[in-house]
């Protein structure tokens, strides 16, 4: 059971699985405590500290700057 928990933590934080679950728990909590910026609680997705709306904003910028002109030139 401890092995499955370690594998889960490896998926969440992108760190190697640790046999010592106490050390792994401490590591996960340290990462969560240090993942605050812009006055908001950052969420951990695939090992990256991602602001809640940063992905949406980047996607909109990508679509507006790159995809829309490309589509306009294609037609």
Curated annotation (Swiss-Prot):
Superkingdom, natural source: Archaea
Biological process (GO), any one: methylation
Principal localisation: membrane
Pathway: One-carbon metabolism; methanogenesis from CO(2); methyl-coenzyme M from 5,10-methylene-5,6,7,8-tetrahydromethanopterin: step 2/2
InterPro entries cross-referenced by the UniProt entry: MeTrfase_F, MeTrfase_F_su
EC number: 7.2.1.4
Cross-referenced Pfam families: MtrF (PF09472)
Additional facts recorded: Unlike other orthologs, MtrF from M.kandleri is not located in the mtr operon.
Protein name in the entry: Tetrahydromethanopterin S-methyltransferase subunit F
The species this protein was found in: Methanopyrus kandleri (strain AV19 / DSM 6324 / JCM 9639 / NBRC 100938)
Lineage: Archaea, Methanobacteriati, Methanobacteriota, Methanomada group, Methanopyri
């Amino acid at each position: 059971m401890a092995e499955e928990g370690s594998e889960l933590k490896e998926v969440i934080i992108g760190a190697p699985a640790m046999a010592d679950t106490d050390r792994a728990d401490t590591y996960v909590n340290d990462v969560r405590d240090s993942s605050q910026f812009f006055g908001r609680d950052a969420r951990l997705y695939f090992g990256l500290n991602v602001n809640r709306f940063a992905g949406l904003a980047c996607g909109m910028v990508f679509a507006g700057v790159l995809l829309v002109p490309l589509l306009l030139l294609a037609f």
